[in-house]
Amino acid sequence: MTTSAALAPISVRVPPGATACRPTWDELPAEVRRLVSRRCGAEVIEATSIGSGFTPGFASRLLLADGRRVFVKAADEQTRAPFAASYRAEAAKLAVLPQAVPAPRLLWSHDADGWVVLAMQDVAGTQPPRPWTQAHLDLVLDALEASAHALTPPPPGVQWPSFADDYGDLPGYWSASADTGRVPAELLPYVDRCSELAAESVGLLAGSTACHTDVREDNILIDADDTVWFCDWNWVVRAHPAFDSLVVLLSAHGDGHDADALLERRAITRALPDGLVDGFLALLLGYFLHQAGEPAPDTSPWLRLHQGWYAEAAGRWLARRRSWPEAA
């Protein structure tokens, strides 16, 4: 593995805070609005929809008549079944996260009458801007290391999927991407090796830490005290404790940071074998190459651009680490 100076950042990116197509508070059925007010113990007098993310579920910050604020997510099982299921899973996971994990606390949940509704602690924070600054990277990576420690082993009370359960099929995306012409020309000579690295990574990335797996800037809030909060705990799996840190470093590399230098600076990543890091990149690269070429869903017209950005970031970092030719 070789390291080199940082790249220029990838310039094409999704618009911040404007990627989701969500229902507003007024568009929720009246019975759901009444449920939320009743469970919160006060009328909702103001609602601010969250424009970030790539899912179509309701997600809004609500101001109550008594001055309190809550964050509420909701999805109906008839038209948004996969998202209702993910909210149900998130409620179960939030309920058992230890206090040491900086996640908004679950206040209550409702799972009946065709709707899954979650009310959570409202965090007065902002998303870290992109491109990443070094200061924000340090805050987030510090918080991820602390969370990994607090979540090893995973807390009892939930059946946590293994890494292979959720990621075991991803190596197959390399053949699918090659068959559909989605592999960039500079990577075509390395398709077989990338497929092998991806397959090997499923075992290397297994572990006994409950990992968030979806640590993007729109799932992070930083408050006035520089406390980092991780949101959207839908897709947690048991994995290697460094997995979430690698996800953030991948985005940092795409923003022009020297991710290999950052690997060496962090206690949780500095001793990782090259095969694990390269396998991580190959695994996500094959998946993102394939998904970026799929038709855009009506739930988020920006999803494929987002996935294409991550494919380019993973391809660049993997090529640099293995001294392969990079795209011009």
Task: Identify the residue ranges that each predicted region occupies.
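A cross-family kinase active-site recognition segment
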Residues: 2-9, 110, 115, 127-188, ...
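Active-site acidic catalytic loop and adjacent metal/ATP-binding pocket
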Residues: 51-64, 71-72, 196-243
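Short pocket-lining segment of the protein kinase catalytic domain that shapes the ATP-binding cleft
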Residues: 118-125
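Short Pro/Gly-enriched beta-strand edge/turn motifs at strand-loop
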Residues: 39-46, 89-90, 177, 193-204
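Active-site activation/catalytic loop segments of kinase-like enzymes and analogous catalytic loops
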Residues: 242-271, 281-299
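Juxta-kinase regulatory segment immediately upstream of eukaryotic protein kinase catalytic domains
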Residues: 2-47
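A conserved alpha-helical element in kinase catalytic cores
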Residues: 70-112, 130-146, 252
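ATP/Mg2+ or Mg2+-diphosphate-binding catalytic cores
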Residues: 20, 259-261, 267, 288-328
